[in-house]
Regions:
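Non-transmembrane, aqueous-exposed alpha-helical and coiled segments at domain scale
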Residues: 89, 104-108, 113-138, 142-172
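Active-site-facing alpha/beta catalytic cores
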Residues: 1-112, 155, 163-164
Length: 172
């Protein structure tokens, strides 16, 4: 940054801003290469990001991605689509957060505006009854993808907002 004339002396917010990174832990050889043991705690951390997440297609309870993330101490996210069940979420929580730590597991809903109200309420009710410490969040872009006439993937803003609104309505 100094080459651009930006330093902590003339831009103090550079040292004041907390920046956290997250990405999908899709390529396991990449993640493994960046995994280290913390010298103080002896715990394993994936140093490629602060929080790692797995997607709908890599969240199988016996999949390599779930196994890998169960072995690191980073906060973890897991995307859940309309085909998921409460039992799926409960099993994932047991494997990814066996100590039921606050802040460890983030379930990321990506069901789509037309499906969230049919599926999330029952999942939420059953999972909450287990007393699991889960952060619930939403990725309203993923479940609302459509193909435009030119073949590009896009989203209708009204559908994105509808899913967000439904997500909060269901939680309250």
């Amino acid at each position: 940054m100094e080459a651009c004339g930006v330093t902590t002396a003339n831009t103090p917010t550079l040292s004041e801003t907390k920046l956290y990174t997250s990405h999908e832990a899709l390529l396991l050889p990449y993640e493994e290469a960046l995994t280290r043991v913390d010298s103080l705690s002896g715990d394993w951390y994936d140093c490629s990001a602060h929080m790692l997440w797995i997607g709908e297609r890599t969240r199988g309870i016996d999949d390599a991605h779930v196994h890998f993330l169960s072995g690191v101490k980073n906060p973890i996210g897991c995307k859940i689509g309309p085909n998921a069940t409460a039992e799926d979420v409960i099993k994932l929580a047991a494997k990814l957060n066996p100590q039921n730590e606050n802040g460890r597991l983030n379930i990321i809903i990506r069901m789509g505006a037309d499906k969230i109200e049919n599926y999330l309420p029952n999942i939420l009710k059953d999972v909450k009854s287990e007393g699991l410490n889960i952060l619930w969040s939403i990725d309203p872009m993923h479940g609302n993808t459509v193909k435009a006439s030119n073949g590009y993937k896009t989203r209708e803003f009204d559908n994105v907002m509808k899913e967000v609104k439904s997500f909060f309505d269901i939680h309250h």
